[in-house]
Design a protein with these regions (language model features):
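Conserved Walker A/P-loop ATP-binding site and its immediately adjacent core
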Residues: 22-43
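Walker A/P-loop
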Residues: 1-13
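Inter-Walker segment of RecA-like/P-loop motor cores
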Residues: 36-82
Length: 247
């Protein structure tokens, strides 16, 4: 579900592991902005609980641990290795490429890979990876193997036949577990059923119900980092040159 603190939780987990073991931690996010959320959480955790000011990217701890925060469009990302966290992977364009890069970064048995995200569309490249269909592909023996049901994945998570541990946390589950920052009945009343289910009940959108397919929208995307004449931190990002505007 959205807004239940998953990014903060994994930021704390990674920081704790870095402090206790000295292992490198790598954070891959759908965008540079999302990657900065991870970094800001860790900086705030260190300041709030330990009175330590962390700076830089990567963040380097006194025990040698490095914490790197990267958007998925960084082609140099695969040169690093360590425990890997992939945030909002159901919203990452070209997930297949991301998964290849992620696999290379966490090849060694000692490294752990954690994927987590809110759901998007069933046509997203990551959907077969989540359901296990990608693992079953090309093998009659694997095709007959059943994966845990949605309800079973909500019940504390399960280790699945492909070796992955999967866990679904809906807003209902979060509230039952002590989350008290949202009123689920107000949320149900605010949205139509389909929107509520996608945002808070971990239900994927079926593209047949959409005006545009997710793949069509993906094709319209652009990597802003490739714009050599654009400075997002400037008062006038494109200087005094003419630009097209749209919505």
């Amino acid at each position: 579900s959205r807004q239940i603190g998953a990014t903060w939780y994994f930021a704390f987990e990674a920081f704790e592991n870095a402090v206790m073991t000295g292992d490198p931690q790598i954070f891959l996010s759908a965008s540079k902005v999302q990657a900065e959320y991870f970094r800001s959480y860790i900086v705030n955790i260190a300041e709030q609980y330990f009175g330590i000011t962390l700076t830089g990217n990567p963040i380097r701890l006194s025990n040698g641990a490095e914490l790197r925060f990267l958007p998925t469009n960084k082609n140099t990302a695969q040169s690093y290795s360590g425990h890997l966290y992939c945030d909002e992977y159901f919203w990452v364009p070209n997930f297949t490429k991301l998964n290849e890069v992620a696999s290379a970064m966490a090849t060694h048995d000692k490294w752990r890979t954690t994927y987590f995200s809110t759901p998007s569309a069933k046509t997203h490249q990551a959907y077969p990876f989540w359901t296990g269909d990608e693992w079953k592909q090309g093998s009659k023996k694997r095709t007959a193997i059943k994966f845990p049901t949605f309800d079973e994945l909500r019940d504390g998570g399960r280790v699945c036949p492909d070796g992955q541990w999967r866990y679904v946390i809906t807003m209902e589950d979060a509230i039952a577990g002590g989350f008290n920052l949202a009123n689920i009945e107000k949320l149900r009343n605010r949205y139509n059923t389909a929107t509520f289910n996608m945002l808070y009940m971990c239900v994927f959108v079926d593209s047949k119900d959409s005006v545009f397919s997710f793949s069509d929208l993906e094709a319209c995307g652009v990597e802003v980092d490739t714009w050599q004449d654009h400075n997002p931190d400037a008062a006038r990002p494109f200087g005094d040159r003419p630009v097209w505007g749209g919505f």
